[in-house]
C-alpha cells in the first residue's frame, strides 16, 4: 500500500514552486495539491491516495492557429528522438523496458497529453 501525502508540508516543499491550492477530497479519499513553478508559471497537480497504481501526465496547451495539424505533428516528433536523445523511437523503448500499464500520447483540439501509468 502506498503512503498517502495528506498535505503540502509533508512533501519537503521545493522553493522553485509555490502552493496555489490544497484540499482533501473525501469522495475519492485523496489529497489534492496544485503548485505553480515560479519561473515558468507551469502548474503541477498532485493527487495523493493509498492506491498502489500511479500516474504521471505531462499536458500542454496547444491551441491551433490553423488546420495544418501542427500540434499532432509535434506530438509525434517529440517521440522520435533528437540530436541530444538519439534513440530512433524512445517511446517504444519505454514500452519495452518499463513496468508501465499505460503509455501513450494524444492530441486534442486544444491540448496535447503524454500520460504514463
What are these regions (language model features)?
Residues 1-51:
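N- or domain-start disorder-to-order transition segments that initiate the globular core
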Amino acid at each position: 500500500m502506498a503512503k498517502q501525502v495528506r498535505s503540502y508540508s509533508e512533501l519537503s516543499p521545493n522553493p522553485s514552486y509555490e502552493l496555489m491550492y490544497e484540499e482533501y477530497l473525501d469522495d475519492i479519499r485523496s489529497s489534492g495539491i496544485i503548485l505553480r513553478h515560479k519561473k515558468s508559471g507551469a502548474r503541477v497537480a498532485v493527487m495523493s491516495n493509498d492506491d498502489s497504481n500511479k500516474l504521471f501526465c505531462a499536458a500542454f496547451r496547444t491551441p491551433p492557429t490553423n488546420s495544418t495539424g501542427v500540434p499532432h505533428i509535434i506530438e509525434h516528433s517529440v517521440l522520435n528522438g533528437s540530436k541530444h536523445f538519439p534513440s530512433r523511437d524512445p517511446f517504444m523503448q519505454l514500452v519495452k523496458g518499463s513496468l508501465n500499464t499505460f503509455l501513450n500520447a494524444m492530441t486534442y483540439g486544444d491540448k496535447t497529453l503524454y500520460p504514463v501509468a
